Amino acid sequence: MIITSNKNFGLLLSIVCVLGLVACGGGGGGGGGGGDFMPVEPTGLTYAGVTSPAVIDSNNAAELASDAFIGGETGSNLGMFSSVADAQSTIERKIKLYEVVQLFDGALHKIDFSNHRGDLLAVKTEQDTVIGDCGGSASYTVEMNDLNGTFTGLMTFNDYCNGNTFISGTAGFYGQVTVDASEFLYFNLSIDMINLTSGDQSYVIDGDVSVDVERPSSTATVDMLMKDSSGEVFWVKDYTLTIFEGVDYTDVDISGRFYHPTYGYVDLSTILPVRIFYIDQWPSFGELQIVGEDGTKARLLAIDKNLCRIMVDTNGDGTYNFETDDISWSDF
């Protein structure tokens, strides 16, 4: 039986999942599976931007809040607080971090671990190829321990397509499934300088995603660098996403540090869990906060599945003295 995702995340955050990763139930996990294919720490990209805390003000709050939420660069006009009435149709859609993670998660879920069981060997190695939902392929080598369900492997993507997004490159993985190979307990993806293209947007991504699954929630940890087509590198560091799946929605609690190459870093946290219904791309409600230097902060409020708003404390005194007009999620 192929392990499949119970439901898709629709945000991150729509930020990691967010993650369709939570798809499988089971208990928590720990450590790697060992073997010749144990992935190594990615080192291909380097963050060379500002490493001090960002000073959040009325000019950069919307950009920083939305970037921290999405995990990378958003439309540049957000810094000007474009309202619904005057939003620019030319703002290019940026790929959200959770969409990136979903791509790899979906590919990993296509591996039929149960097919690698049943012979007399406790530890066995298998090779196969899976096809993308909209083209391309991903070939993998996986070594699985039949006795305890641990596995480790390497997957190579060749224009692998899902949701009209294409990826090429290599990712190592390891983790553990239940002894009957029906559910993931935990897994780690080590993404090594993979090229990602969606429409006219292109990125190079490098980093790690770890997921512990425990019904009805899962916890994902993300540390990832993303380089856009202009050459700027953004960094999401120690992002933790606690994901709870309801009947027709996903609730996400997010925390972590986001590094913007121009402004510096902000610390992201959740005031109210973000809720995304499975039929929607964006959250219907929830509230996130970023904090920068000297207590300056901004809050991102989801009004509904179409609109959000940013509140800003430019003085660090706890009073929000600036508020944007309603902003369309699509501007992100």
Regions of interest found by a model, annotated:
Residues 2-12:
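Bacterial N-terminal signal peptides that target proteins for export
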Residues 14-18:
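Hydrophobic helical h-region of N-terminal Sec-dependent signal peptides
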Residues 33-332:
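Low-complexity, intrinsically disordered segments exposed to solvent
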